[in-house]
Structures are given as structure tokens and as C-alpha cells.
Amino acid sequence: EQALTAHFSEYVSMQWEKLCRDAVTGNLVNGVVYGKAKRWWGSVLNEDKKPEQVEFDVMAESLEKKYLLVGECKWTTGENGKQLTAELLRKANLLPFAKNYTIVPVLFLKNAPKDDAGNAMLSENVVELMK
């Protein structure tokens, strides 16, 4: 029971990420249909031309190959939407393969962010996508 309690939020966070990827895959998100959503991480050159490890909880290419959805999943409260979005865009713009796409940053959040950038999807939105 203690082990479950100690790792419960970590477990829920992992399931939330998977649910968000499943919700994006093959579905219409803000008017665009995306292919298979995956987790992506790797080393890129940052603004100072130094190697930097970046990670995306959700990444999916639109079926017409014009848009690249990059997403951050947070199962916590009190997130700063504008700050998270700025960081998502910063990281996405470091990706060499992202140059040919319009980047679509999406925050998948448990609760509405305290500083909303207008790109948050809450749990009810994710569930709605899966219907």
C-alpha cells in the first residue's frame, strides 16, 4: 500500500500521457487530423549551438503533413500555460525536421492553467476526442 501511495501520481501521469497520445492519434484536434502520436526525445543543438536533450510527451504529424503537434502532459495543478507553451515552442523550433511544419503547441492538463495561452486541453476535452 505504501509503494502504491508513493508512486501513484507517477503512475497516473504515465497513464495520462498515454491517454493523450491515444486521443490525438487519428482524431480531429482543433480542425486538423493527426497520424500516430508518439513520445519523442533526443539531442538537438540549442540556441547557443550546444547539445541539449529535449523531450516531447506528445508529437504527431498531420495527415496532410503541414502541421506538427507538440504536446506537454501535466497531471498537476497550477501550471503556467504561457510559460509551458513558450518552452514547448522553443524546443520544437530546435528540431531540424520541424522546419517544414507549422508547429501546433498543445498543453494536456488536469486543470485549467493559471496563465492560459489558449491552447490547453483538459481531461474532459481528451475524453471527448476519444468518443
Residue ranges, per PLM feature:
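A cross-kingdom feature that marks ATP-driven nucleic-acid transaction machinery
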Residues: 1-131
